[in-house]
Amino acid sequence: MAGKTLYDKLWDSHVVKQRDDGSALIYIDRQLLHEVTSPQAFEGLRLAGRKPWRVDANLATPDHNVPTTERSAGVQGIEDPISRIQVQTLDENCEEFGIVEFKMLDKRQGIVHVIGPEQGATLPGMTIVCGDSHTSTHGAFAALAHGIGTSEVEHVLATQCLVQKKMKNLLIKVNGQLARGVTAKDVILAIIGEIGTAGGTGYAMEFAGEAIESLSMEGRMTICNMAIEAGARAGLVAVDDKTIEYVKGRPYSPKGELWDKAVAAWRDLKSDSDAVFDKVVELNGADIEPQVTWGTSPEMVAGVSGSVPDPEKAEDATAKEGISRALKYMGLQAGAAITDIKLDRVFIGSCTNSRIEDLREAAAVVKGRKVAANVKQALVVPGSGLVKEQAEQEGLDKIFIEAGLEWREPGCSMCLAMNADKLGQGEHCASTSNRNFEGRQGFGGRTHLVSPAMAAAAAVFGHFVDVRELI
């Protein structure tokens, strides 16, 4: 009998009941909550007269709608009335149902997918859900993590279980070592460029290989964060010493004898050597260069030394139409060099790239330089209050401010047009976020997905440059 994949092990250990239709009732260990997808779920509990099944399995924080500028006025200072109501409602719901919340003025507040690992609320072997598609981030810890809808948020609150269908297994193996200046963001963009945004549909995607093993936990979180952009609902990386070292000593992590037992169990959270995957894709890490998206889908990506594609050379009519539409929206010419794309704004942040290592990489590039005259605004938005605090202790805030970038409060910010940080129509933005869809960062905004180092370089040069030449 063949061995088990990591996904098989996680799935099998959480099945409560197998159903006749092929689906299964799965136990959920942790639910993360934010202000956008939880209000109706709490209202559903209230209308049904139910209480959360396990209050301590939930952790909440506002992130999507919070302002990243001055917060001294608290929730009442949020200008947009809908955003203010959503944040207020989360506060009220968590208070009513007894759920721990890191409120807007709590220094532990931040983006859900940053604070979960930061607090040790994300642990290896867990099933983790959140009403947010980028919940796949937590798979970096060998946790089975994926986004859910609002009705499912209510179901988990009420029962701590979900009905799910088992996915197939996909192995993405990135062999060899990455070149200097090539980051986890470049790796995942290159993967998506290779397999497309539907390449992982129906699969749990495990990332392995020498290049993945060499990444820090923060880098692995970036990789798993964007598994959803490759069509996979969940991304996974096996447990190793880096995983255990990262989790150790965090507030929600096990302590004492429980820690020793947990580590012993976590060591098995890897695919068996004889495990069989439904599909395997291999890439050579040494071939990956810094990546830049040129279109309106994460799969529309090129190396920084490349150029914007010509729709006339597309492989079929559908691809030709897609490229043509993207170029029209993005205001780009076929054949233009990636390094000729000029930027109006720069955004360094989001659940993909707002952790301390991301900020260090960006600061190293802008240190001693100034934001280019054609760049109207360059934002740096830490992923949590604790990341912000650490960055300030290291003096990173001063480096950014001296270079002309804005240092903000934690939140989702310009990743999505749900708060005050937005692009204007026709503006090009170098963004460390995860989605470059039409209007994602603001009506008519043009998003180019890049790594923190590439975004920082774009801020000071005013156009894309190969960051490998700067470090």
UniProtKB/Swiss-Prot annotation:
Annotated Gene3D superfamilies: Aconitase, domain 3
Cofactors (names): [4Fe-4S] cluster
InterPro entries the record matches: 3-IsopropMal_deHydase_lsu, Acnase/IPM_dHydase_lsu_aba_1/3, Acoase/IPM_deHydtase_lsu_aba, Aconitase_4Fe-4S_BS, Aconitase_4Fe-4S_dom, IPM_dehydratase_rel_enz, IPMI_cat
Keyword rRNA-binding found: no
Pfam families: Aconitase (PF00330)
Domain of life: Bacteria
Pathway: Amino-acid biosynthesis; L-leucine biosynthesis; L-leucine from 3-methyl-2-oxobutanoate: step 2/4
Cofactor binding description: Binds 1 [4Fe-4S] cluster per subunit.
GO molecular function annotation: 3-isopropylmalate dehydratase activity; 4 iron, 4 sulfur cluster binding; metal ion binding
Top EC category: lyase
GO biological process: L-leucine biosynthetic process
Residue numbers binding [4Fe-4S] cluster: 351, 412, 415
Catalytically driven reaction(s): (2R,3S)-3-isopropylmalate = (2S)-2-isopropylmalate
Its EC number(s): 4.2.1.33
Coiled coil: none
UniProt keyword terms in alphabetical order: 4Fe-4S, Amino-acid biosynthesis, Branched-chain amino acid biosynthesis, Iron, Iron-sulfur, Leucine biosynthesis, Lyase, Metal-binding
Summary of subunit composition and partner proteins: Heterodimer of LeuC and LeuD.
Function: Catalyzes the isomerization between 2-isopropylmalate and 3-isopropylmalate, via the formation of 2-isopropylmaleate.
Entry similarity comment: Belongs to the aconitase/IPM isomerase family. LeuC type 1 subfamily.
Name of the protein: 3-isopropylmalate dehydratase large subunit
Origin species: Hahella chejuensis (strain KCTC 2396)
Protein's gene: leuC
